[in-house]
Swiss-Prot record:
InterPro entries to which the protein is assigned, alphabetical: Euk_RNA-bind_prot, HAT, LSM_interact, Nucleotide-bd_a/b_plait_sf, Prp24_RRM1, Prp24_RRM2, RBD_domain_sf, RRM_dom
Domain of life: Eukaryota
Biased composition (Polar residues): 953-965, 973-986
Start and end residues of each stretch annotated as Disordered: 1-21, 556-580, 953-1006
Record flagged with keyword Nuclease: no
Domain (RRM): residue spans on this chain: 590-667, 666-743, 757-832, 874-946
PROSITE patterns, sorted: RRM (PS50102)
Coiled coil segments of this chain: none
Reported function: Functions as a recycling factor of the spliceosome, a machinery that forms on each precursor-messenger RNA (pre-mRNA) and catalyzes the removal of introns. Chaperones the re-annealing of U4 and U6 snRNAs (small nuclear RNAs) released from previous rounds of splicing, an initial step in reforming the U4/U6-U5 tri-snRNP (small nuclear ribonucleoprotein) that can reassemble into another spliceosome complex; this step involves binding U6 and facilitating the unwinding of the U6 internal stem loop, followed by base-pairing of U6 to U4.
Source organism: Schizosaccharomyces pombe (strain 972 / ATCC 24843)
Subcellular location: Nucleus
Record's protein name: U4/U6 snRNA-associated-splicing factor prp24
One annotated Gene Ontology cellular component of this protein: nucleus
HAT repeat segments: 57-89, 95-126, 148-180, 286-318, 442-474
Amino acid sequence: MSQIQDLKDENVEMDIDPQEQNEKKPLLLDELTKFTILHPYNYDSHIKLIEELKRLDKKKELSEARKTFQSIFPLSEDLWVDYLLDECKNCRTLDDYVRIKTLFDLAVQDYLSIKIWCMYLEFTLNLMDTSSFEQEQSELNGVITLTDAHSLFERAYQTCKFHFSKSQCVWTLYLEFLQTFGDALFEGEEEQEIVFKNKIYDFHIDRLKLPHEQIEETFTSLSTFVTNNWSPSEYEDVMVKSNKVYETTLKRNAKIFNKELLLNSANHSLEAYMDLINDESRRSTAELQYITTLYERAIVLYPLIPELWLQYTAWLSKVDFSSSQASSVAERATRNCSWIGRIWSIKLTYMTLSGASTSAVCEEKDRCLNSNLLVNFDEVIDFFSGFLKACLYLSSNEDKPQEFLKHQIHKVEDYLRKNHKGSKDARMRIELSKIYLYSEISDFESVEKCWSDMFHDFQNQALYWISRYISTMKYNPELAAETLKKSLYKNVDQPQLLFQFYQSIMDLNNDCFTNTSHLYDVLNAQRISFKRQLDSFAEETKQTVENTEPLKVPQADDTAALSKKRKPGQEGDVFKKSKPIEQHRNREELTVLVTNLPSDISENELKIFFKDCGNIIRIFILEDNQKDVKVAQIEFSETSEVLAAKTRDLKSIRGHEISVQIHVDTNLYVTNFPPTYDELDITKLFSAYGNVVDVRFPSLRYNTNRRFCYVQMRKPDEAHNALQLHKKLLEEKYPIQVFISDPLRRTPRSGAVYEGRELYVTNIDFKVNEKDVETFFRDYGQVESVRIPKRFNQHKGFGYVVMTTNQDAENALSAAGKQLGNRVLNVVLSKPRESLEKTRVSSNDNRTLAKSFETTESNKMSTPKKSFEQIKSKSLGVTNVDGTVNEARLRSLFESYGKLYRVVLHPEHEGAVVEFLDIHDAGKASLALEGHEIGGRLLHITTVNEMMHNVPSSMNHSDYNTSATRPRRLGSRTFQGFNSNHSNINSKKDDLDDKEMQIDAPKSNDDFRKMFLK
């Protein structure tokens, strides 16, 4: 089957094998040529064709293919450079020069490319140097006049001079041109030498007036020029005047330089460009050409971003730019983003304003539609909406403007009926444009017909009724008021917006008595609307309950079975109280955002305002971008309370009309950041993308290895903006992961352990390394990774092997019992670590100090055995440790006072054990870190004994075994891991005498310090 038959879709990617045999190449070239003819708007096919022609060195066909490509699509900077370099090599005749000059003119129109401008200027300088011409280039002698060259250099400089970082190379080429051809350029003028000297001086001064990165080089060049061309007596006066210009520009230059540094640090991201553009646009002394250059610089990097082109073309309409210049930008916008209807409509608008004829505008409209570039219905609507508005201006050129407008409306309706039958525009753009045109020609009967036709589809939209009122007020105020009154009782999407609009209209147009009578309608409609919302919520709740699997009711046989006498030990199974289901806070759906609040609003005032809505869990009051107002985030406990809070939308607080919206998509789930990061580090990281409201770390009580947090941003757009951090490398080893938090999208845990691909291998020979283990297990399948934990450069005798598939892992289980090195391996599948919640011990099974310091057998074999007193003397007990503080943060804090042996968290005691290698380091740390704040708490340094006795104030005792327990007798040795029967004590612990095994009575801080400082 031929390749061309597989390329039916316009958007298909043409993956063509470059290693195809030579005899098939002509066939491939023919198919590419045919395909580009059949599908001229397929970008990739043009690229493939050009690459193939270039490989085959078909220069003539290559030039034609590039010409066709450029006529349809704007070429990128790299494509233009490649194109122009090839063409410049073959500049031999006058026709070649005309063709290449035309290409350069087209290239500099597409994008503001300093590289292409420099190529253009160097090409011109080379042609003016006839001494380097070959014999066959004789036609090129004098092809460029001095005046034409001067005009070109001036155009290049004026176009590029506001490019802060790269415009200097254009200026330098221009200066070289003036210095080389200045004598001939100013020949014949009186006092030619003085004119030339002043021209070069003014050229430097003009450059110094503009901020640019190489401003010091420019000033140095000026100083050298003045030294060489002015007498010593004149030098000082000239340089004093020049220095004033230089010093004035330096102040502006420093500000822009700092902004350019931020741009570089952001890797020239689109967001950084837009921030810089918006910042410059707000300045009262804004330089319009500098802002234009910023837009052009952004477009070079992001030519296919529609929002960038839309903002650029819209900005041109607000500033003092000619319609022809704006029309040129719009033309380029359609070439880059030809699938965006709004951009096409803006182009037609600028064509109309620049004086284009009706036929020219209509031809451009038809060209857009016939090319099938607007495939999305929404884009077609945007296009026609703008076109109909432009028709109002075009009708002024017609003999019968009303008939022209109606004809264009009917053509649009016919097109939509034929190509998009059944599609509806929820934003009513075409309908509103039609109503606007009918109103302008005073055809109010057609206006009413439009509103009536829209009623069926849009009667539930508040925007429909508000727009209808505004439109009808122009020709029938009484009908408008009556229509708006009826809309109050409609079940619309934004009832509060409609109520507030109605009240505002009544306040503007009626006296106090009439206003009072209308108040009844508003209050009654609000009551009905609120009842609708509650009924809707109740129905949704009912459906949720019905879809939930019902609880199983015990049958008669089951009841009888329960009534029988049970065996001892079965009571717990039958009568154990069921643990209540833990209710998770769904902050994403239970928080509302309140904006436009008074700047001095208080939390108590907000509680009073929303008290009737429900139970408020917490309130955050934040600064807004506008300094005179604030915003607040209010979290409720139930969905119905959020709906009730929504009824406060558009209400007033001390003269401020507030907005209340459900606050979704503001919480971010963040993981895989450096273990030492705390709330301040996370806040600093995310503050670059918006205002951070809150950072919440999880409790480590049941899993000390958790490393994630939730970051709440002020607004949804700020949260989405922060997604740019996703996969950014922190500290050169941690690719952070950032997601919009969505509890409804929680997925089951995944990974090697959960997929049954990880093996737990024990009894590994201490002389064996990870490479040996990997080689050993390759006999059973493909090995993904091997990890053998180490301490002090010696592994512990166990490790983890991850296979590529679970089948390979099953095969590798047969390695159990086989010898590696001098030991026989034990191999089992790794199991997910159960949370401490499931393995929690009873409250009477108190952990002991000896148990806290118990080491594994592998540790005993790899490190010298230490006495219990030695371990205890170098260990600190740390209490009041917040449940969100992990081991890495504690280690980072304590290791600044000396080398650590280990850090062990004890979340059940809100504490930790920190063991140093040196007793003096432990003493220094105990004195220095007493009362140190971490995680919002002040640490208390004590003994390990006291820490292990610590009962957190926040502990819920009902979570533990609630059976009655006897107070422990002083001197008793019955504790976790040991029995009163001495024969059951592990023989390996015989070296610990009874005194060492006993938990000491709690010591005071003074006793503890004396132990270290004696």
